[in-house]
Amino acid sequence: MTASPDYLVVLFGITAGATGAKLGSDEKELILLLWKVVDLANKKVGQLHEVLVRPDQLELTEDCKEETKIDAENLSSAPQLDQALRQFNQSVSNELNIGVGTSFCLCTDGQLHIRQILHPEASKKNVLLPECFYSFFDLRKEFKKCCPGSPDIDKLDVAAMTESLNFEKSDSVSRYGASQVEDMGNIILAMISEPYNHRFSDPERVNYKFESGTCKMELIDDSTVVRARGLPWQSSDQDIARFFKGLNIAKGGAALCLNAQGRRNGEALVRFVSEEHRDLALQRHKHHMGTRYIEVYKATGEDFLKIAGGTSNEVAQFLSKENQVIVRMRGLPFTATAEEVVAFFGQHCPITGGKEGILFVTYPDGRPTGDAFVLFACEEYAQNALRKHKELLGKRYIELFRSTAAEVQQVLNRFSSAPLIPLPTPPIIPVLPQQFVPPTNVRDCIRLRGLPYAATIEDILDFLGEFSTDIRTHGVHMVLNHQGRPSGDAFIQMKSTDRAFMAAQKYHKKTMKDRYVEVFQCSAEEMNFVLMGGTLNRNGLSPPPCKLPCLSPPSYTFPAPTAVIPTEAAIYQPSLLLNPRALQPSTAYYPAGTQLFMNYTAYYPSPPGSPNSLGYFPTAANLSSVPPQPGTVVRMQGLAYNTGVKEILNFFQGYQYATEDGLVHTNDQARTLPKEWVCI
């Protein structure tokens, strides 16, 4: 609770575009600023002041011209934004005769005038706003506190407030903007008088700057997160904060997303302090950052934690010094040392803390990845460092990029939590032989490319028309990207090569929801490669990460056991057993033994009906096995992530279970819950 100001300055802004609830959503510039001073102590209202503002683009919408009676000729000789703000500041200072102990605060009709007009436009034009624009009273919220029985805030405009107070509409001022300021002054006088006696004591705040920091695995409200898409590759968290200037982003709440190769994919997740600020951020959909327009969509707290959460001790220690500028180095020699990095930047851009300000990225086995993060104390040092982009360190040129705390976490988490590829040992979990595996050279599948992201399986069936009856059971496979979202691709398994060929010929480049879709004939092998994370292009097949050569490939094989289905398993439904889905090579799970590390980037999350790519090795089509000891496999779902072997065995206390070697941890990327397999 802060002290009530001596004066309120009622402020109202008009842009060259939309008005009312859509004010500022069309990115139009400010053209008129109106204000009036209210003396709270003496309960007096001052004179109306206004100043025209010349925008960079002298184009006004027809609605704006009709409401404001302003045209381009009036604006051609008007002052620009910085000059208009100086006039405003000078006028208020002269009228209030501000001295020691005198205070005033702005008061607006809602949040839009300050958060969606003045701050974003001033940021784009590099105009420094006066101190008074970083705190203001929202008259709608104050009126709701004063009159709890009034309409909801989203419906509470100036007209609704005057109606609630039973004011007679004044005909003395009829111009748009001027009439609103006149009514707001009268509303304030009524609120501070009997019987309300309202005190203006808790103003809204606008953050001066974005605070970087780490994000812990805490509960995040889904209604506070947005996804920004289409960002320039070199953009940083500070650029994102500047795009959302005027809205309060939570500390460390701007997280840049990385693709499967660890490079930025042009997306970011942004967490705001409240749902109100998130909703205002959504109104900036397709606003511009430089020459690029940025798409803004709703996201979830889970999405944000996947990108920015899970800070390790190493990362937390590195980022413990706040307000540091982070630069990412890429392409370092694997033998590079901290001393060489310090010498690379030199005296003109000293690293914060010397060697302590450098964080090398390594694989889980300690091998360097060629990446590192460096801290600089100020923007000037960081800019000097970025000028060394593509300079040589040893015999390799080094790429330098502005980075963020969230990117440090992502990169470290990505490499430190890479999946471990176990050496093949005799399988212990029965895998039933599949009923049918198509020859890899039979082109009885089709690939759909360029699907709308919102396309469903039903949309695909409608798109294929008569050929939808020729699709095999569970034969539609949607390809997801590394974030679990549709990639625009899908594979369809047809009943014959002829029908696949005819479908590809007939529907190639036909439209689905205003987008033309490319249809190609392909084989089951090509489909499996893509669904497991590989790429299919004109140059042929690029294998998925799990198909890449291991660092130390095993040099031995195991005898194939006889394919037998245990009688104990016959009482269970097929869905409860590890039965591979149709049209997928037979697979077998292996226990965790001696581990190898794979150069891991990311996998496509497998959609239902698609082959999974984690936790097992492809084996020969006729290979299947049973546990070496009699028993039955029981599947457990919904386990907590920190559940260990001891907790599972305690759960089965009283039953005779196999040794701990008979318990296999699996991690299904297509699921959000862990599961365990126990041999009893």
Curated annotation (Swiss-Prot):
Domain RRM: start-end pairs: 224-301, 325-405, 444-524
Taking the record's annotation, the residue ranges forming a coiled coil are none
Gene3D superfamilies for the chain: 3.30.70.330, Ribonuclease H-like superfamily/Ribonuclease H
InterPro entries (UniProt xref): ESRP, Nucleotide-bd_a/b_plait_sf, RBD_domain_sf, RNaseH-like_sf, RNaseH_sf, RRM_dom
As for family, the record states:
Belongs to the ESRP family.
Task: Give a short account of what the protein does.
Answer: mRNA splicing factor that regulates the formation of epithelial cell-specific isoforms. Specifically regulates the expression of FGFR2-IIIb, an epithelial cell-specific isoform of FGFR2. Also regulates the splicing of CD44, CTNND1, ENAH, 3 transcripts that undergo changes in splicing during the epithelial-to-mesenchymal transition (EMT). Acts by directly binding specific sequences in mRNAs. Binds the GU-rich sequence motifs in the ISE/ISS-3, a cis-element regulatory region present in the mRNA of FGFR2.
> What is the protein's name according to its record?
Epithelial splicing regulatory protein 1
Tell me the name of the encoding gene. Answer: Esrp1
